[in-house]
Amino acid sequence: MVSERKTPYPAFNFTVNFNAAEIFGGFSDVSGIMTELTVAEYREGTDPENHVRKAQGIHKVGDVTLKRGVIDSETMWDWMQQARTQGPAAKKDVVITMLDEKREPVQKWTIRGAFPLKLTGPTLAGKGGGDLATEEVVLSCEAVDFGELGA
């Protein structure tokens, strides 16, 4: 008998992997994993009911934002350049895996057909303060799949 977990998983244990790409550096934040259906509203002119009927419309996904510390790697900037010059050939699949306290995978999202939409470099300040230099990439994607871990 498999027992179901009653407490939520911590949000700070996760991995980000880019299929067929060498993107290095650990990411500190992932946000925007979202999928939704639009609603198509209609009403037939002869319908005796005086209300709008609703049907499922087009499936949409949101942009996914990733943040990481700046490291000695230009792979994100290179990917942005590929997206500008190579078009659809620059698309990659991104797999985000949430881990439990033992660092075992528990949930997985596959961001399909992703490409960088926006890349923001670090905010630098001469006054110091101990903050780390971080960069942010916003990915546009075609689909988000919530998948089984063995798949």
Language-model segments: residues:
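Glycine-rich, low-complexity intrinsically disordered segments
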Residues: 1-151
